[in-house]
C-alpha cells in the first residue's frame, strides 16, 4: 500500500499539546502517503499521551495519534518483515537549570518574569515539562523482559537519548549520565544490534559505526 513507506522519528516531535497549529500538523500528517513511527522525547505532552488508548502493532504496544502516526511505547520489541526493532523513548531535560515552575503557585507570574528577565533556562510543569519524560522502573523492567524474550538480539534500536558511553562521545559536557542513559548502557552491553538510532543531542552524525545520532 502507499502507506507501506515507514518514517521513523527518534523523539522530540512535540506531541501533542492542544492548539490549532498542532491540529493542522496532525491532519497534514494523516494525509501523507507514509506511516510515521516515533518514540517519545522529553518535550512531549505526556498528559495528552496518557489519554490515548494503547493498542498492538507488529507485536508491541503502541498509541495511535492518527491511523498513520504511531507512538512506539517504551520497552517494546516490534517485528516487521523479519526486522526486529527495540524502542525506548524519553530523556532528561537539560534546559531546566532555572527550575520547574508550578502554574498553581501564587507567585508563579513573579517567578516566571524574573526568570525570563535573567535569561534562565526553566520550564513550567504540565505546560512545557512533564516528569514522565523519564521512565519508571516498570518501563525499564518491561524492556528487559521483552529483550529477554527476543534473546537479546534485535536489528535496530531507536531511542531519544542514548547509552551513557555513547552520550559521552556525542553530547559533550552539557549532558550527564542519568538513570535512563545508564539503563540504555546496560542494553548496549547485553544486546546484539546492527544499528542504534537516537536524537536529543541536536546534531546529525555517526558517533560510532553502529550508533547514529539524527
Predicted segments — roles?
Residues 18-20, 47-50, 97, 166-169, ...:
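Short glycine-/acidic-enriched loop or helix-start segments at secondary-structure transitions
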Residues 13-14, 42-45, 91-92, 162-164, ...:
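Catalytic metal-binding/acid-base residues of hydrolase active sites
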Residues 180, 195-208:
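Charge-rich, low-complexity terminal tails
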Residues 154-159, 192-198:
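Proline-aspartate-enriched helix->loop->beta-strand connector
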Residues 78-80, 204-211:
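Short loop/helix-cap segments at secondary-structure boundaries that form the rim of catalytic
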Residues 174-178, 208-214:
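Short, electropositive alpha-helical surface patch
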Residues 67, 81-174:
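Active-site-proximal loop/helix segment associated with metal-binding centers of metalloenzymes
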Amino acid at each position: 500500500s502507499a502507506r507501506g513507506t515507514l518514517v521513523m522519528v527518534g523523539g522530540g516531535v512535540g506531541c501533542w499539546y492542544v492548539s490549532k497549529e498542532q491540529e493542522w500538523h496532525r491532519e497534514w500528517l494523516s494525509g501523507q502517503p507514509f506511516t510515521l513511527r516515533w518514540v517519545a522525547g522529553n518535550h512531549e505532552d505526556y498528559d495528552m499521551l496518557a489519554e490515548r488508548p494503547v493498542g498492538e502493532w507488529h507485536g508491541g504496544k503502541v498509541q495511535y495519534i492518527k491511523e498513520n502516526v504511531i507512538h512506539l511505547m517504551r520497552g517494546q520489541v516490534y517485528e516487521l518483515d523479519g526486522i526486529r526493532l527495540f524502542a525506548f523513548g524519553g530523556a532528561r531535560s537539560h534546559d531546566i537549570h532555572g527550575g520547574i515552575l508550578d502554574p498553581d503557585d501564587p507567585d508563579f507570574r513573579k517567578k516566571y518574569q524574573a526568570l525570563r528577565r535573567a535569561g534562565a533556562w526553566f520550564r513550567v510543569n504540565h505546560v512545557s515539562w512533564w516528569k514522565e519524560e523519564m521512565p519508571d522502573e516498570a518501563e525499564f523492567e518491561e524492556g528487559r523482559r521483552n529483550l529477554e524474550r527476543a534473546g537479546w538480539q534485535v536489528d535496530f534500536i531507536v531511542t531519544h537519548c542514548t547509552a551513557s558511553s555513547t552520550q559521552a562521545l556525542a553530547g559533550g559536557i552539557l549532558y550527564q549520565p542519568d538513570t535512563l542513559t545508564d539503563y540504555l548502557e546496560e542494553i548496549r552491553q547485553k544486546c546484539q544490534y546492527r544499528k542504534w538510532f537516537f536524537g536529543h543531542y541536536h546534531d546529525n552524525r555517526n558517533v560510532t559505526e553502529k550508533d547514529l545520532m539524527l
